């Protein structure tokens, strides 16, 4: 009985957290500003005329890319896309499944997957990686950024218990998923409250 009540309570919290304004507030409280600045510094030299943000939500990471790039925010939650459109009127909001993107092959310079992979099963993540590979041009990059499991960080363990994602991974497991399709050209780990992994993979011209 107590377990069922606990599950219902967590489920109710997840529904509240999915509301765009609550989602943005939680991200800010969880140290998103530091994450944005780190990603901005890491991707500063990447060619980025067309950027596809997989699971882009409300578009909080739009600012790390050039103002004149073509920015596509792809998500499954319409309320978040509407919030994105309000914040980024010149961006393109696409309601779509990331494992079946309605985008042309070779049409993107960069595909980003930020704070998304822990919501995806292993098989689904493989399909998303395959789709990212398809829509990237030769030489294009995928930017993968996500919290990872570190059992030595007690605050991270606590945050995982509250997270909506059902598939947390270690940094090593996440890198293996990236290496399945891409050549890893950048990999680092850092901590805010969670521990994070930030990786860049390149689609080689010969692939």
Predicted region positions:
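Conserved alpha-helix/loop element of class I SAM-dependent methyltransferases that forms part
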Residues: 29-47, 60
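A conserved beta-strand element that flanks and buttresses the S-adenosyl-L-methionine
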Residues: 112
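Short catalytic micro-motifs in class I SAM-dependent methyltransferases
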Residues: 115-119
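A short glycine-rich, Lys/Arg-flanked "PGG" loop and its adjoining helix->strand segment in the class I
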Residues: 126-138
